[in-house]
Regions:
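Charged, often glycine-rich, active-site loop that binds/positions anionic groups
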Residues: 72-89, 145-146, 285
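Flexible loop/turn segments at secondary-structure boundaries
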Residues: 34-37, 72-76, 138-139, 279-284, ...
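N-terminal catalytic cores of NTP/NDP-binding nucleotidyl/phosphoryl-transfer enzymes
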Residues: 1-83, 230-251
Length: 486
């Protein structure tokens, strides 16, 4: 696949090959600290990387796609939406992997959040190689990288100070490492000295412990963030990793990491781009209250099919802020996806070839794949389209019975086949959830049983009489275009 599609993922893939040259394998990376619920904003990074991975593979490149769980970071504060707050507070300053799971489902707090994400990603066609930083650090796999940082600490100090004003420059003795106490597991420690080899001395202000560690065997030694990130770029030979706009600000962590990577680890920083924030609107009360206003990809998949969820990201440049809607705009988003689908299948004609190639590429990248490659449309049958608005009406007419709705659709002339019904079932589940949990009251209706008109209350009769001509016409359209066709 060439970058002539004009799609941002193809452009990024072409840039990676241009800057890194031809390689046997390209490594694309993403990652996050599982310090709380992994929300939809975090998901933007991983799907942005996955889309670039697909673009590289479409160019015939061999790609390693890694996702790092930074689960050896310190547990700094308890998120507001977590249960057992008092119990979690007892584990502040511990590594996240040493914090107990408050739901008592998984081995620890970090693993709980990791599992939640790892279970849902395949639903949207994302299957990276997961790397657990706690395991890497505790097995001393980074010992050489840590020692290199200690050897070059003056260089590191100069790099960090380059982006700081006089007031915030590093003062006095400074070390690029931190230590989790061997006795109490907290990071409330200070480095007392490095012997120039593998020995590192520290004392703990929390429990009074004093130790000298061998970094080749110790489990608690860790690089500070701005050094840890570039060290891992060199270790994994990362060619591409995007970052949020806060990291990409002048003097931000990407700026310093780029210099550290080259000047300390003798490795060129990966190709990158900045991704922007995501907003949400129209959240139903039930959804927002259950997770403390933190919206996850699982929440999004209750309203959007995996393909439409991918479409939101594939169709938007990463450096553009956008909003994921749960209100009436959901209908418009499904309509936009359906239009792109019709253009991709040449059911609808695009204005010109450029628009066709762009829409087709967005559609291709929106499709779920289990093998990490973009599914081909060659030899396949177009999906059977039922507009989301229409489907919502059909489900309400069937009193929420999805199987009846699908059976009625299959019974009409030229209705969907078995394979198409499977795709429609996914959309119908989203439509049912949206109607019952997100749609405004005026969008909802129910059919009265035969003779039900006589059971209308005086207030309901008055409301019917008060309908405007426009509203009466809308009722007629609903009757003629929906009910009478079932």
């Amino acid at each position: 696949m060439k970058a002539s599609t004009g799609h941002w993922a193809d452009e990024a893939a072409a840039k990676i090959v241009f800057e890194k040259g031809e390689k046997e394998q390209y490594t694309c990376a993403s990652g996050i600290t599982p310090s709380g619920t992994v929300h939809i904003g975090n998901f933007r990074e991983i799907i942005s990387v996955e889309l670039v991975v697909r673009a590289l593979r479409d160019m015939g490149k061999n790609v390693r796609f890694i996702y790092s769980w930074d689960d050896y970071d310190v547990f700094r504060k308890v998120p507001a939406n977590m249960p057992k707050q008092d119990e979690l507070e007892k584990h502040l300053r511990f590594p996240i992997t040493m914090v107990p799971d408050p739901w008592e489902r998984d081995a620890n707090y970090a693993r709980h959040h990791e599992v939640d994400v790892e279970k849902v990603l395949p639903k949207v066609g994302i299957n990276p190689e997961f790397i657990y930083q706690a395991e890497r650090y505790r097995s001393s796999r980074y010992a050489q990288g840590i020692r290199r940082a200690l050897e070059k600490r003056d260089v590191l100090k100069n790099i960090l100070d380059k982006f700081r004003d006089e007031e915030h420059k590093i003062q006095g003795e400074w070390q690029p490492v931190s230590v989790f106490c061997e006795k109490c597991n907290k990071d409330e420690t200070e480095i007392d000295g490095w012997d120039g080899d593998w020995g590192l001395s520290y004392h703990c202000s929390a429990c009074g412990c004093q130790e000298k560690l061998d970094m080749r065997k110790a489990k608690g030694v860790k690089l500070v963030w701005r050094i840890d990130w570039p060290m891992r770029w060199e270790y994994e030979k990362v060619d591409f990793e995007p970052a949020g706009k806060d990291h990409h600000s002048h003097g931000g962590s990407f700026d310093t990491a780029r210099h550290v990577c080259k000047e300390v680890y003798d490795y060129d920083a990966p190709v990158s781009f900045r991704y922007d924030f995501i907003g949400t609107k129209g959240l139903p009360g039930k959804m927002s209250s259950s997770s403390g206003n933190v919206i996850t990809i699982e929440d999004v998949l209750k309203v959007y099919t995996p393909e439409v969820a991918r479409f939101l990201f594939a169709g938007t440049r990463p450096n553009t802020e956008f909003t994921i809607s749960f209100d009436l705009d959901v209908i418009k988003i499904y309509e936009d996806y359906d239009k792109t689908e019709r253009i991709a299948w040449k059911i609808e004609t695009a204005k010109d070839e450029t628009i066709f190639q762009k829409e087709k590429r967005i559609y291709e990248l929106s499709q779920v794949s289990s093998d990490g490659k973009t599914p081909s449309l060659e030899g396949k049958q177009p999906p059977y389209q039922v507009p989301f608005r229409h489907l919502c009406n059909l489900i309400q007419i069937a009193d929420g019975d999805i199987e009846k709705t699908l059976a009625d659709l299959a019974a009409v002339d030229n209705g969907p086949n078995k394979e198409q019904l499977a795709v429609l079932r996914s959309r119908a589940l989203c439509a049912k959830y949206w109607v019952e949990n997100c749609a405004p009251d005026e969008f909802r209706f129910r059919l009265l049983p035969s003779g039900g008109a006589a059971a209308l209350s005086q207030e309901e009769r008055a409301k019917l009489r008060s309908l405007s001509d426009v509203e009466k016409n809308a009722v007629r359209i609903l009757r003629d275009d929906v009910i009478c066709k079932i």
